[in-house]
Amino acid sequence: MLIGLITCLLVGGLCIAFGAVNMTGNLSTLHAYHYRRVKEQDKKAFGRLVGLGTILVGASVLIYGVLMYVYEKTQSNVWIWVGTPLLIGGIVAGAAISFYAMFKYNKGIF
């Protein structure tokens, strides 16, 4: 459905935009408790890692939306077989990178 494509494009695009903001060292898109104990000199590195994770999640959602739209038009299951693992893998990898950064620089999630 077209609404699914639009939703995935919006959610994925927002995640990519927020990740890009974080990668510049601007942590304003995060809750304060996610970076409360991050040292000032580590904020840039922390932002890069969290931003990379967020961009990875956003890109996987965006690509998944496009692949599911193609599936709806072609009814070829190959798009599901490619899109679903890509979505799950992107979310898991992106979350892992973000959590790694939080544990490394913030000494925990909270």
Region annotations inferred by a language model:
Residues H31-V38, K104-F110:
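Cytosolic juxtamembrane segments of membrane proteins
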Residues G47-S60:
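Select subsegments of transmembrane alpha-helices in polytopic membrane proteins
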Residues M1-I6, V70-V78:
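Helix-coil boundary and interhelical linker segments in multi-pass alpha-helical membrane proteins
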Residues I16-Y33, A101:
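Membrane-water interface of transmembrane alpha-helices
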Residues V61-E72:
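Transmembrane alpha-helical segments of integral membrane proteins
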Residues N77-F110:
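Alpha-helical transmembrane segments and their immediate juxtamembrane interface regions
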Residues L2-F18, L86-G90:
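Alpha-helical transmembrane segments
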Residues R36-V50:
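Short membrane-interface loop/juxtamembrane segments of multi-pass integral membrane proteins
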